[in-house]
């Protein structure tokens, strides 16, 4: 039964990811000037696509950084469950109040980190930017647990390549993360080929320009994703089976993945492999 449920979850995540990429492409077309091109017609098409992921596992938001408010949201009511009535600010305060106690510093740490790291990125490198967050745990007001994975990307920028609009995609990966994992991590990739990185892991709180997984670990994980077994991986990379096992364990521990299947999925979602 557990295996069936896990497969269903992975299929749902893959479906959401595919729709996300379609939405991203459409969004770049819609938000291609100071104003929104054919706003009403295009937003209806965008909303139709977004409804493909409507449910309790994911939601998408197009955020306006000029007004500091969502331009469009789909799936957020199902995702967060029942919330008290109020304006956008009150709702955000309520949602942050749902953070599990181990993550109460997340809003402050992540904003401080992101602000500092963004200032370090040269103008010419501010392209193809993607921001991933993973591992933050919330408990809904009805008691249901949520573990967040989010992907954000700018879909319109100003002359200095500061964000005007971003597309933010949030999933509940509660079933992909180990129950005893009490950390979160963030990864920014950017550049023509996504070759530049900034990362942060709450376990050590180190600001880094290295990836969360090493080059060797990613080599191993790519082979795992291609269904190579431990012995085949060891032979392919001229290392021992024990070394393969150690790297696998270290990757699972670092990302908080529940198992190897979840590890591969998380790495693909962040484009580490």
For each predicted feature, which ranges?
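Short alpha-helical "packing" element that flanks the helix-turn-helix/winged-helix DNA-binding module
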Residues: 217-224
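Basic, Lys/Arg-enriched C-terminal extension of HTH/homeodomain DNA-binding domains
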Residues: 2, 252-273
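Intrinsically disordered, low-complexity terminal regulatory regions
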Residues: 1-67
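PAS-family sensory domain signal
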Residues: 38-94, 189-196, 200
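Recognition helix of helix-turn-helix DNA-binding domains
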Residues: 227-262
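Sensory/regulatory domains in signal-transduction proteins
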Residues: 63-85, 90-179, 183
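Regulatory hinge/linker segments at domain boundaries
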Residues: 193-216
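Juxtadomain coupling helices with adjacent low-complexity linkers
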Residues: 23, 173-201
């Amino acid at each position: 039964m557990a295996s069936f449920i896990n497969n269903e979850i992975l299929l749902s995540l893959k479906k959401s990811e595919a729709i996300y990429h379609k939405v991203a492409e459409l969004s770049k077309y819609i938000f291609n000037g100071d104003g929104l091109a054919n706003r009403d017609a295009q937003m209806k098409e965008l909303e139709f696509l977004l409804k493909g992921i409507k449910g309790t596992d994911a939601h998408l938001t197009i955020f306006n950084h000029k007004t500091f408010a969502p331009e469009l949201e789909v799936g957020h009511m199902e995702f967060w469950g029942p919330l008290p009535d109020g304006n956008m600010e009150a709702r955000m305060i309520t949602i942050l109040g749902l953070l599990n106690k181990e993550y109460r510093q997340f809003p402050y740490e992540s904003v401080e980190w992101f602000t500092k790291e963004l200032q370090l990125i040269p103008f010419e490198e501010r392209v193809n930017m993607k921001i991933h967050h993973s591992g933050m745990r919330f408990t809904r007001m009805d008691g249901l647990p949520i573990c967040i994975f989010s992907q954000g990307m700018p879909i319109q920028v100003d002359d200095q390549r500061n964000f005007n609009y971003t597309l933010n995609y949030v999933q509940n990966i509660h079933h992909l993360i180990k129950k005893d994992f009490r950390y979160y991590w963030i990864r920014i990739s950017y550049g023509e080929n996504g070759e530049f990185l900034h990362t942060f892991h709450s376990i050590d709180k180190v600001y880094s320009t290295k990836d969360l997984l090493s080059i060797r670990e990613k080599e191993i994980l790519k082979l795992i994703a291609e269904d190579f077994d431990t012995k085949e991986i060891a032979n392919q990379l001229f290392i021992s089976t024990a070394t393969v096992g150690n790297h696998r364990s270290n990757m699972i521990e670092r990302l908080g993945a529940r198992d190897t299947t979840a590890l591969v999925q998380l790495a693909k979602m962040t484009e580490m492999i």
